[in-house]
């Protein structure tokens, strides 16, 4: 077994663990039946604002377009027959991470369990790129509601949907239901929710 050279060791040390806004658009709600048809991974700085690292986005051709839910397609406006093959997208994600020296991603998003479960099933060989630590604006809103209920007797947010939280926090642009826009919305929403938590 050979030891790594100094240069190789430096490259290993330089591999990044990053925050990234993450969102998928899918052809339905069931990962066992439906497909990912769009993905966005947008690197963020520690303050949850967009970083200088390039984002990864892709349209993905559905493996089973015949299973697509018409209502889901109507919401996103995406055609499940368009995009790259999912195997190519998997290769492209790996290359994007390698080119940018990214080792692990802490996902930032809204209702991340949905997106991460879909990703794990559709990209099983890549699921370990995501850290077990994540930053979910929906979960943060639920925590804030719990604190508010304890302190004031009522919830601060009547609904923790992305649409309703955006409206309540002054983000007036409508939810786009496209992965890039929704990923960035979730990161912005997370920052705004943080202002509701005061740590003395």
Name each region found by the language model.
Residues 2-120, 167-172, 177:
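Conserved non-catalytic scaffold segment of RNase H-like nuclease domains
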Residues 106-112, 117-122, 153-200:
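Acidic, Mg2+-coordinating catalytic module of metal-dependent nucleases/exonucleases
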Residues 95-102, 125, 195, 199:
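Secondary-structure boundary motif
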